[in-house]
From Swiss-Prot:
CDD domains named in the record: Ribosomal_L7_L12
SUBUNIT field: Homodimer. Part of the ribosomal stalk of the 50S ribosomal subunit. Forms a multimeric L10(L12)X complex, where L10 forms an elongated spine to which 2 to 4 L12 dimers bind in a sequential fashion. Binds GTP-bound translation factors.
GO molecular function: mRNA binding; structural constituent of ribosome
Functional summary from the UniProt entry: Forms part of the ribosomal stalk which helps the ribosome interact with GTP-bound translation factors. Is thus essential for accurate translation.
Stored PANTHER family: 39S RIBOSOMAL PROTEIN L12, LARGE RIBOSOMAL SUBUNIT PROTEIN BL12M
Family note: Belongs to the bacterial ribosomal protein bL12 family.
Species: Nostoc sp. (strain PCC 7120 / SAG 25.82 / UTEX 2576)
Protein name in the entry: Large ribosomal subunit protein bL12
GO cellular component terms, semicolon-separated: cytosolic large ribosomal subunit
Length: 130
């Protein structure tokens, strides 16, 4: 490499990430180019994988109800609901509630998951459905 290119390379190495991003934008504008990946081979290979990954999300039929957290003053109410939903004994349900975040029910139908979420939230727990 020439001295000029060595000097440019050294200057590029010293740029912060923000400065490098700004430089890329300026180069794109100045030369009318794009730093995005070409629309050829790599993108074509990634597209079917991305489409296949998107399909299961649209057709998801099984959901997990995850208890994220329980305020201390609501623990007993949430514990009762968890016992009703899961059919667990008192000790097992207590262990589950205290181990939050933890899955309460797994691989259940959407309506059952939404119902469980609603009941636990009404009792005071924080829940997510995945």
């Amino acid at each position: 490499m020439s001295a000029a290119t060595d000097q440019i390379l050294d200057q590029l190495k010293s740029l912060s990430l923000l400065e490098a991003a700004e430089l890329v934008k300026q180069i794109e504008e100045a030369f009318g180019v794009s730093a995005a990946a070409p629309a050829g081979g790599m993108m074509m290979m990634a597209a079917p994988g991305a489409a296949a990954a998107a399909e299961p999300v649209e057709e998801q039929t099984e959901f997990d109800v995850v208890l994220e957290s329980v305020p201390a003053d609501k623990k007993i109410a949430v514990l009762k609901i968890v016992r009703e939903i899961t059919g667990l004994g008192l000790k097992e349900a207590k262990d589950l509630v205290e181990a939050a975040p933890k899955a309460v029910k797994e691989a259940i139908a959407k309506d059952a998951a939404e119902d469980a979420k609603k009941r636990i939230e009404e009792a005071g727990g924080k829940v997510t459905v995945k």
